[in-house]
Amino acid sequence: MQGMNIAVVGGASGFGLETAKLMVRDGVSKIVVIDINQERLDAAKGELAGKGTEIFTVVRDIARAEGAHASFDAAVKTAGRIRSSICAAIYPRAPLLEITDDMWDAENAINIKGTYHMMVAAVKHMQGHKAEGEVSGRIVNITSVDAFKAHPQNAHYAATKAAVVSLTRSFAHAFAKDQVLINSVAPAGMATEKAKSLGFLGELAAANPLGRAAEPAEIAEFVVMVAGPKNTYMTGEQVIVLGGYIYA
């Protein structure tokens, strides 16, 4: 990924931050981390700095069009041409019969609308760099195995991730002519700090044939591959990384 400029939405913590770390490891030139939380952004910048990559941060709420487009515009202003854009998002839980309107609104705003608006901003930018025989840009959305499997403990999240799978396919089909490659990576449960703090690791291990949750870096490697220069042809695909979970 040397010489590439990357934007990571939701990259100040959790899986997004892990992905940013691997991209820095692989030598990206500039990385722009977009998040709603300034304190987490400051901490993430400290973790990513000092390894040869220029680190920029943008604090924005991407739940509405103006915030999403402003965040991407800021990324371009600070880093120049963005070669790849990665969009990660939230992971709340609620019992199936207790999902409130506020929960639905928050989930839809970030996971569906936010992802949609970030893709619009990225595609418009990448269309401006179309060149014969070259990839104009790459977009990777983080979905979930829950998009393909019943998950009553997390149904609103699963529904939004299924929507993102559909959006990914539609965008990929529409903008293949512009050489913009758009895919998603769908992990099963990961051993993130949040999952650890909520006591989910035992549950995740019991549900997985491999007997453990994935380490975030194991999944992030696939994001790096799909977002990187070795991907010159794949678009509209869902890379499902789940340790056999969906077949259990």
From Swiss-Prot:
Glycoprotein keyword on record: no
Record keyword Oxidoreductase present: yes
Catalytic residue positions: 157 (proton acceptor)
Ligand binding (substrate): 144
Enzyme Commission code: 1.-.-.-
Pfam families, per database record: adh_short_C2
Keyword annotations from UniProtKB, A to Z: Oxidoreductase, Plasmid
InterPro entries linked to this entry: NAD(P)-bd_dom_sf (IPR036291), Sc_DH/Rdtase_CS (IPR020904), SDR_fam (IPR002347)
UniProt xrefs under SUPFAM superfamilies: NAD(P)-binding Rossmann-fold domains (SSF51735)
Superkingdom per UniProt: Bacteria
Annotated GO MF terms: oxidoreductase activity, acting on the CH-OH group of donors, NAD or NADP as acceptor
Binding sites annotated in the UniProt record for NADP(+): 8-32
Classification via CDD domains: SDR_c
Root EC class: oxidoreductase
Disulfide partners: none
Family: Belongs to the short-chain dehydrogenases/reductases (SDR) family.
UniProt name for this protein: Uncharacterized short-chain type dehydrogenase/reductase y4eL
Species this protein is from: Sinorhizobium fredii (strain NBRC 101917 / NGR234)
Species lineage: Bacteria, Pseudomonadati, Pseudomonadota, Alphaproteobacteria, Hyphomicrobiales
